[in-house]
Amino acid sequence: MNSHEILLILAFFALVLVPAPFLGRYCFKVMEGQRNLLSAPLAPLERVCYRLFGVDPASEQDWKTYTLALLAFNLAGLVLLFSILMLQGSLPLNPQHLPGLEWTLAFNTAVSFVTNTNWQAYSGEASLSYFSQMVGLTVQNFVSAAVGLCVLVALARGISRRSTRQLGNFWVDLTRGTLYVLLPLCLLLALLLVWQGVPQTFFDYVHATTLQGAEQTIPLGPAASQIAIKQLGTNGGGFFGVNSTHPFENPSAWSNLFEVASIILIPAALVFTFGHYVKDLRQSRAILGCMLLLFCLGLGLSLWAEYQPNPALAQLPIEQGAPMEGKESRFGTAASMLWAITTTAASNGSVNAMHDSLSPLGGMLPLLNMMLGEVIFGGVGAGLYGMLLFVLIAVFLAGLMVGRTPEYLGKKLEAKEVRLLVFTLLVMPVGVLVLGAIAASLPGPASAVTNPGPHGFSQLLYAYTSGSANNGSAFAGFGANTPFHNLMIGLAMLIGRFGYILPILAIAGSLAAKKASPVGPNSFPTHGPLFVSLLTVTILLVGGLTFLPTLALGPIAEQLSLGF
């Protein structure tokens, strides 16, 4: 690594960690309806939204009502987006006269964006009109991120409140998260991207003649606005087919830095938001420390793996540097691996290099990030509520080891909460191992892999892991656009999203109804280095050990076949 690459990584951490505490406090004020920096310009618009949709901002909901409102909203969004994609050919802002999508692809895409996954079995510039990109996908990018924020806030209230059945109002939380948090940040990032050269236009595609005399079509469109929310909302779906490797999505080193840092900006800030809810920022620092430890470990190992020469070519009389296949030469290895680890540590899925071309170990680390449940920062809201599940599991295990009733911040964890926690541990294995095994065992679906041997298995494993983890990145050699995979990966995305949300809201409701006992000297501290170590080990063992056999059949076997 040279000095420029080291400076890039340091700048990345600075852009994320310096504003995170301030943004976290701002998010707390917003979600609790306190006066904040943008109250003056946005509060009147917020009140208009409530009047327009008949919402009483003073009323609150219990966990069941909150859950029903969330499910109804997501179902309506799914039906609306599916209809837009099917009827695309008859809708406006379609200068290329693109037809509607085939129904299984439309279903897969609608589920993908509603669940904040943004798995793309299509190429945006060749398949979707401007209307579908803006009114369909971009809207869901905003609201799916806001839904994740709502679930996190409900869980934080459940942990911090006492002897109540109320978790807040879903419609109020959704409005505030979108209006005060996502829209202002996306406006700022979109302007920065336009400054760097990302297109934001309704003009038709440009037809040009190259120097060799060949005809070329240059796609345009309102890209900057969608790219801003796809990064900040941890959505990840690209306006163009090759995502942020495309020079129109990511034209410069500055745009690359802005985009990769924005992936985990809000997830990092929400760690501090949680600290404000429980009135103990030490909890935030402990959770953030665990996240950073796992993140830096993955980044360091991936950089080491990608800077190694290919062992299969070691006997040849050639000088090898870091392999550059699948990487943008304008960014290089360090920027590519920083993005790969960041996009899979969060549930983002955007890419600035092709993960299918990484070394076996370099490709395994993004895969492992997803298998851990996207808790290393994770998605907007989704990452922290996933991490809090592991916090509760770690507290439960600590209670078993010392023979005490486990409790977290004064709230006792009883049989009901533990059963729900165990249920969430089964979500990823069902999506990855069960659905993936069905796909691998049938000859038709298995033909979607384009490589023989362990790497072909890794392609299929990555696809179903990405869908179940609501990430959306891919080993792009996998032929995903078939009716079977469209439906099965769509099912995996639904399981991965709502299989977590439903038990989390139930846990939040149960904890909110409990009384909190004062934290005393006999309580297990959840803010020191000992707990950070216990939490890290819990994530690696409980979250990662489940998938070790599948990793052995895929990337580990591929690495051993090349020579270590």
Swiss-Prot record:
Top-level lineage group: Bacteria
Alphabetized UniProt keyword annotations: Cell inner membrane, Cell membrane, Ion transport, Membrane, Potassium, Potassium transport, Transmembrane, Transmembrane helix, Transport
Membrane topology classification: Multi-pass membrane protein
TM annotation in the entry: 4-24, 67-87, 135-155, 179-199, 258-278, 286-306, 376-396, 420-440, 487-507, 528-548
A GO biological process held by the record: potassium ion transmembrane transport
Subcellular localization, as worded in the UniProt entry: Cell inner membrane
A GO MF label: P-type potassium transmembrane transporter activity
Chief location of this protein within or outside the cell: membrane
Family: Belongs to the KdpA family.
NCBIfam families: kdpA
Subunit structure: The system is composed of three essential subunits: KdpA, KdpB and KdpC.
Role, per record: Part of the high-affinity ATP-driven potassium transport (or Kdp) system, which catalyzes the hydrolysis of ATP coupled with the electrogenic transport of potassium into the cytoplasm. This subunit binds the periplasmic potassium ions and delivers the ions to the membrane domain of KdpB through an intramembrane tunnel.
Protein name (database record): Potassium-transporting ATPase potassium-binding subunit
Organism whose genome encodes this protein: Pseudomonas aeruginosa (strain ATCC 15692 / DSM 22644 / CIP 104116 / JCM 14847 / LMG 12228 / 1C / PRS 101 / PAO1)
Taxonomy of the source species: Bacteria, Pseudomonadati, Pseudomonadota, Gammaproteobacteria, Pseudomonadales
Gene: kdpA
